[in-house]
A protein has these predicted regions:
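C-terminal motif of bacterial Sec signal peptides marking the signal peptidase cleavage site
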Residues: 17-20
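Short, recurring structural edge motifs at helix starts
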Residues: 27-34, 96-99
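Long, charged/polar, surface-exposed segments that mediate recognition or autoinhibition
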Residues: 67-154
């Protein structure tokens, strides 16, 4: 009887562990995200890892095709002590594309700043790059390394630049006093796809 009880206890413990582990995995992909991409794609995403970068790359593939005249901002919030436990939220800031890529970006950035309750301080002086500069120079100025930090990332699919269409990351770091610092990272389109 004691042996049977011990076996049952062990099986129960294993089951509890499995349930607990699967619960933790699911928390990496909130229901809003799973509903948006579908369970099959969400499961496939798990094989890519649970890093912010994997989620961001995947989101480009999912949302990029529909981001025509609007910028879809997908926010992943987390911190180093709860790595991977990211809350999913979506913020859409309307922005009409125009022929001037710089003013288009500047206008959309201003709208993002207002929507998030800015002003922000930024690693890139947006006003320091003139509209006359070619896009390559502008993009080079915006290219920053996120340093692997997993605090909060805002991203949008850049549309309206023809063959230069790419992804611009805005890494948003909230501070205790309510202000924020923004890092901008330009990611070429070919690097923004899932392998």
């Amino acid at each position: 009887m004691k042996k049977q009880f011990a076996v049952m206890f062990c099986l129960l413990a294993i089951f509890a562990c499995l349930v607990g582990c699967s619960g933790k995995t699911e928390s990496l992909f909130p229901s809003a995200f799973v509903r948006a991409v579908g369970q099959e794609k969400a499961d496939a995403l798990k094989t890519l890892g649970t890093t912010e970068q994997a989620l961001s790359d995947y989101t480009v593939d999912v949302y990029g095709k529909t981001a025509d005249v609007q910028l879809s901002f997908d926010a992943y919030r987390g911190d180093e002590t709860s790595a991977g436990k990211l809350n999913y939220a979506e913020l859409t800031v309307p922005c009409t594309p125009n022929d001037d890529g710089f003013s288009y970006m500047r206008t959309c950035y201003d709208k993002l700043e207002k929507a998030l309750g800015g002003p922000f301080t930024t690693d890139v002086n947006m006003d320091g790059v003139s509209a006359e500069d070619d896009t390559d120079t502008l993009f080079a100025a915006l290219q920053k390394n996120a340093g692997g930090e997993n605090v909060c990332a805002l991203q949008y699919q850049w549309r309206g630049l023809g063959e230069n269409e790419s992804l611009l990351y805005l890494y948003y770091y909230p501070n205790e006093n309510g202000s924020a610092r923004v890092k901008l990272t330009f990611l070429p389109k070919e690097r923004a796809q899932i392998p």
